[in-house]
Amino acid sequence: MRRYTVYGGSFDPVHCGHMSLVERAVALDYEVIMVPTFRHAFGKQSAPFEHRVRMCELALQACQLVEHARVCTIERSLAPASGAPVYTYDVLCHLRAQLGSAPCLLVGPDISAEWERWYRHTEIDQEFGRLCLPLTHMIRSTDIRQRLRAGEAPTSLSDVIPEPVAAYIAAHGLYR
């Protein structure tokens, strides 16, 4: 029976730190389902959803993880018309029904530090569990966006974002 873990995030943009978590979960014999947020639960504004989904797909291809990881756009179909956010608990419940087993939630220590703010965090722990992996790359999407807005060329950031993601950012003029 396959073991699944769900890795949700803004992925704005996806970077090598994100991919390191995916690689390590795969090494632990999990199939990783990356779920970009459609509407952030804490109101954070992001690049358009379709761009973030495509960047995640490119990152998985670049890191040769497509056999063990995939991008899932379930948040778009679950998003209420009211503009309310989609909560992780609801995503996990829907994926459990689709997969036939309960996936655990892949998180880094940054999420663990704010875990009690999350909607139905106790139920997530009880029904799904968390796979908490330490960060090996101290990279923040916020810092990447700031560097790009300051005029740094996306291709100069290949140490922190996969090259196809950098090329995509440049081609679409994101984060200017």
What does each of the following model-derived ranges do?
Residues 1-176:
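Nucleotidyltransferase catalytic core that binds NTPs
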